[in-house]
Design a protein with these regions (language model features):
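Winged-helix-like regulatory helical subdomains adjacent to P-loop NTPase cores
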Residues: 253-327
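Conserved catalytic segments around the Walker B and adjacent sensor/switch elements
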Residues: 58-80
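Short, amphipathic alpha-helical interaction segments positioned at domain boundaries
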Residues: 358-378
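Helix-loop-helix "sensor" segment of P-loop NTPases
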Residues: 173, 189-243, 255, 264-267
Length: 378
């Protein structure tokens, strides 16, 4: 029977080894311990596709549950966010109160005991703020809390996000109830919702940039799962794998998974040939799962900028990109900023940029050839 592949190349799935994130998790755990006055009690995690934002939400939810907290997880990009949050909070209340009309003095729910007296005021369903006030008071009486996590904030309906923020501003920040919030978003949120003067709650949240892993963290994230499953990877193969990931946690999982899968017998050792084949498959998937959706979200000028970069063999100079596009240096600087936010390129010193993903250049060149062929055939 083949040894089980230890890697998890699925968006949002927690990896077998979470490397390079201990300091951030410690900070957020400290915030849950400290309470609503802590600046990180309401936090935004900002990072590009494949950097592990959703995994971090999963991990913080785990920290909260280990403290005996309730958790409520939602995706902001799906319409009806406020309705779903209201239903989730009311459901938590029903579980604790054992029925909205029932007068009770003690109940055990979610592993903790509560001593209180509560009576619903009316038959009407509680709206989000009212429900959070009641739930927050119940949880505070027992020294616990509720953690709300929202993913894909950059794609949320602005009106709903503002409404949610207004509620949390009152319930958590002003009234100091134990309702913590962690949101995750792509960097574009800084030019949209976070630039909206009416979204003051989000603007006041603590912010953490979810950066790429350094080489040592990527090395640990690849080598440790292999070793834990009784397999080995030789030093050259590991170096090759680490370089191919560009520090992206999702790419770490893809390279690890397909290197293991390609190997005839991982328990006898994964070699450089296995890793090279695994990288080929991982880069194909990164093109489909990360580069292609990002490309479709870009403007025509953004796309032309990237195609102009793809003609270089290494780092690109903004002046040369401007010449290729026939525009001014100041003009391309605007799109440089946009593409950094989109997670497609990285700044590399004064006037220079590079692709964020190692495979982006070949992916773009293939796309340019395909587009040219279609134009020629047409």
């Amino acid at each position: 029977m083949a040894a089980r592949n230890p890697f998890s190349p699925t968006f949002g799935a927690s990896p077998p080894v979470l490397a390079g994130r201990d300091d951030l998790l410690d900070d957020l755990d400290d915030a849950l311990e400290a309470g609503p006055a802590h600046p990180d009690y309401t936090t935004l995690l900002i990072g590009g596709r494949g950097t592990g934002k959703t995994v971090m939400l999963n991990e913080v939810e785990g920290l909260a549950r280990r403290r005996g907290w309730l958790t409520l997880s939602e995706t902001a990009s799906t319409p009806g966010l406020i309705d779903r949050l209201e239903r989730g909070v009311r459901r938590s209340l029903r579980q604790i109160l054992d029925g909205p009309q029932r007068r009770i003095r003690s109940v055990t729910a979610g592993g903790f005991g509560l001593e209180f007296e509560a009576t619903a005021k009316s038959d009407a369903p509680l709206e989000l703020r009212e429900a959070l006030v009641v739930l927050g008071d119940v949880l505070a009486s027992n020294g616990t809390g509720l953690l709300i996590t929202l993913d894909e904030l950059q794609s949320g309906e602005p009106g709903e996000i503002r409404e949610f923020g207004t509620v949390l501003q009152h319930v958590t920040r002003r009234e100091q109830r134990p309702i913590a919030f962690i949101g995750a978003a792509l960097p574009q949120i800084e030019d949209s919702l976070l630039a909206d003067d009416s979204a003051t709650f989000l603007q006041r949240c603590a912010r953490y940039d979810i950066e790429r892993l350094d080489n040592e963290a990527a090395r640990i994230a690849i080598a440790e799962p292999i070793e834990r499953h009784g397999a080995t990877i030789d030093a050259d193969a590991l170096d090759l794998a680490v370089a191919a990931t560009s520090g992206y946690p999702f790419m770490v999982q893809l390279v690890g998974f397909h290197s293991w899968k390609t190997s005839t017998d991982p328990l006898s050792g994964i070699n450089s040939a296995d890793v090279a084949a695994g990288i080929d498959e991982a880069e194909r998937l990164i093109g489909r799962l990360v580069l292609s959706p990002t490309w479709r979200s870009l403007s025509e000028v953004d796309q032309r900028f990237l195609l102009a970069m793809a003609t270089d063999s290494g780092e690109s100079r903004l002046g040369e990109i401007a010449d290729r596009l026939g525009v001014s240096r100041s003009y391309v600087s605007v799109y440089r900023h946009r593409l950094i936010k989109a997670g497609m390129i990285l700044p590399k010193g004064r006037g220079r940029v590079a692709f964020a993903h190692r495979s982006a250049r070949s992916w773009l060149r293939n796309r340019a050839e395909y587009t040219q062929e279609r134009l020629t055939d047409g």
